[in-house]
Amino acid sequence: MERIKELRDLMLQSRTREILTRTTVDHMAIIKKYTSGRQEKNPALRMKWMMAMKYPITADKRIIETIPERNEQGQTLWSRTSDAGSDRVMVSPLAVTWWNRNGPTASTVHYPKVYRTYFEKVERLKHGTFGPVHFRNQVKIRRRVDINPGHADLSAKEAQDVIMEVVFPNEVGARILTSESQLMITKEKKEELQECKISPLMVAYMLERELVRKTRFLPVAGGTSSVYIEVLHLTQGACWEQLYTPGGEVRNDDVDQSLIIAARSIVRRATVSADPLASLLEMCHSTQIGGVRMVDILRQNPTEEQAVDICKAAMGLRISSSFSFGGFTFKRTSGSSTKKEEEVLTGNLQTLKIRVHEGYEEFTMVGKRATAILRKATRRLVQLIVSGRDEQSIAEAIIVAMVFSQEDCMIKAVRGDLNFVNRANQRLNPMHQLLRHFQKDAKVLFQNWGIEPIDNVMGMVGILPDLTPSTEMSMRGVRISKMGVDEYSSTERVVVSIDRFLRVRDQQGNVLLSPEEVSETQGTEKLTITYSSSMMWEVNGPESVLVNTYQWIIRNWETVKIQWSQDPTMLYNKMEFEPFQSLVPKAARGQYSGFVRTLFQQMRDVLGTFDTVQIIKLLPFAAAPPKQSRMQFSSLTVNVRGSGMRILIRGNSPVFNYNKGTKRLTVLGKDAGALTENPDEGTTGVESAVLRGFLILGREDRRYGPALSINELSSLAKGEKANVLIGQGDVVLVMKRKRDSSILTDSQTATKRIRMAIN
């Protein structure tokens, strides 16, 4: 108190005030504080003080030639005294203004190209629509989101190589551009940025924005695609939200969305094939999304979704260590358990064998519309705290948690038999049986669970079996919270294994994913998905199956022809004919197949009846298991366009039309390709001409291996023998001539010899 009084008295004296405001500071410690080191101690003050001077800026001497000494108002722009300690000129801030208005202009053509992401953002905002603001409590949960719209999906290393190649092509250092996308982007950017005067560092920084996905762990309530995240600060606060529709889409969001749709279709299709894992890999490798190979996208894209992760696991890529159950992503946050097989009885006295997790564990559960914290002991739910968008979403989370807890009262709540099957008609495992049962109807489950009185805890309410909120009572252990549960933030990826039924396990043997977890939701992909695999032909309906089957036969006609004559059974078993069977009326499949196979056998036996067009037309029908019958058909029926359409055994029809003039085939009016050989002339002339230089020895001799096509003969050495398939579908044994002189006579003798060899 004394000191303060003393200070007050001092301040009353005018001399004190003068010392404090006018005199220079000359205390050594203070001078030292502000002058030692290169670091500016008070940047704001320094700036104000500098700008108050007449010439605070220094510039290169050349500036004198470019800028007049005075501007239009007659104010001086630079001083004739040079800067102390350097050979630069002292310049006024007014010179900057003059330069901005009258200085030289550079070409602006590169700006939209280099700053593409900014220009596009402005366009999106310009065309976006902002709706009303609503005030309400926001349940935000932290999710890993993409904060950088419009990027490609290169890894940091790949992008670095591209940037070095584009911006600093002459720098030393090994750069390996391997992936298709790397090469494409490099080529495109080099062309775009010719003669570019923007500083290379800036170009490099902007390129990085364009090439690499940047993610952040942010609190979000609502859309998570990058075009929503870029306006997150405008669309949601602590207690308000503003509705917003983006004014444009970006390719990276479209890739993510289309990838999920493709992966789901592929997993669903693979599940019903004989070898799901092999089929899945075949489909992933032959599918393109927006013109890019799906396997390349899977390697680069960090999207975490059940089907996508199954595809990644099949390719041997690492995936997140969290597991999926009932459409929720579970992450164990503490505790541990051991697994033990146990037999339990349902309320219907059906025995189920379940793998019980023994031990206390805590999990976070994150779904699309609800999140929860689950604490459980051995076959007992200790506590479940749920938050969700609506009653329905909250109920979904509660059902999944109750089933996951494996409590006895849940198993006893089963009414009726459990016999759910997957798409391949295989019974689901017991945990998924229970889940499906209660997802259909959870009334008994909630009624039998039991209720308890609850304490009043801030931000939490109880929930009754009829799903109404209550502050007094709640289903045992279950509470509803206003706060969401954050998604698991770690981006750590683990090595996993996958079995042929597409069950994905971590290295401890825990099942992380299985096809039962793949959503049935169908959507329309934003980018074109091209499934080249025959297994996916049926995705686009019966017409696509029909056209694709015939296109495939024509594309592979050379090898199909050989198999047709030598090993028809192997040909009939080709998976490319599988989808076609669903178009043939069930009752007729076996009879059609038997009839066509008999017809084909006659063609093989009787000389001169080999008819390429007819073989192509009827081949898919021969793939079904044949029934022996005496039935003859003049046409075969296929179910397309909602009704049965006829394919004529002899001649054209709207379904199958071969034009002799153009040699092209149209199926249902769609072009299915051209036949390279002429199917109507028995092709003897053509074949015998090709056989010049070969001696025909006689009938086929199996010791010389499978029949070669005419095209493959050229690889034979002189004197070497081989079986060869000739036009009528017959096989003969030939030897390549040792001398070239006698070639001329070959084509005449060949024709005679072929006839003899066959007869």
From Swiss-Prot:
User: What keywords does the record list, in alphabetical order?
Assistant: Cap snatching, Eukaryotic host gene expression shutoff by virus, Eukaryotic host transcription shutoff by virus, Host gene expression shutoff by virus, Host mitochondrion, Host nucleus, Host-virus interaction, Inhibition of host innate immune response by virus, Inhibition of host MAVS by virus, Inhibition of host RLR pathway by virus, Inhibition of host RNA polymerase II by virus, mRNA capping, mRNA processing, Viral immunoevasion, Viral transcription, Virion
> Which molecular function GO terms apply here?
RNA binding; RNA-directed RNA polymerase activity
Where is motif Nuclear localization signal found? Answer: 736-739
Q: Where in the cell is it found?
A: Virion; Host nucleus; Host mitochondrion
Q: Which GO terms describe its cellular component?
A: host cell mitochondrion; host cell nucleus; virion component
Q: Which InterPro entries match?
A: Flu_PB2_2nd, Flu_PB2_6th, Flu_PB2_C, Flu_PB2_CAP-bd, Flu_PB2_middle, Flu_PB2_N, INV_PB2, PB2_helical
What is one GO biological process annotated to this record? symbiont-mediated suppression of host mRNA transcription via inhibition of RNA polymerase II activity
Q: Which domain of life does the protein's organism represent?
A: Viruses
* Main localization (coarse): virion
Coiled-coil regions listed: none
The protein's matches in Pfam families, at most eight in alphabetical order, are given as: Flu_PB2_1st, Flu_PB2_2nd, Flu_PB2_3rd, Flu_PB2_4th, Flu_PB2_5th, Flu_PB2_6th, Flu_PB2_7th
Q: Where is this site: Mammalian adaptation?
A: 627
Q: What is this protein's function per UniProt?
A: Plays an essential role in transcription initiation and cap-stealing mechanism, in which cellular capped pre-mRNAs are used to generate primers for viral transcription. Recognizes and binds the 7-methylguanosine-containing cap of the target pre-RNA which is subsequently cleaved after 10-13 nucleotides by the viral protein PA. Plays a role in the initiation of the viral genome replication and modulates the activity of the ribonucleoprotein (RNP) complex.
Summary of subunit composition and partner proteins: Influenza RNA polymerase is composed of three subunits: PB1, PB2 and PA. Interacts (via N-terminus) with PB1 (via C-terminus). Interacts with nucleoprotein NP (via N-terminus). Interacts (via N-terminus) with host MAVS (via N-terminus); this interaction inhibits host innate immune response.
Family according to the record: Belongs to the influenza viruses PB2 family.
Q: What is this protein called?
A: Polymerase basic protein 2
Q: Which organism is it from?
A: Influenza A virus (strain A/Swine/Wisconsin/1/1961 H1N1)
By which gene is this protein encoded? PB2
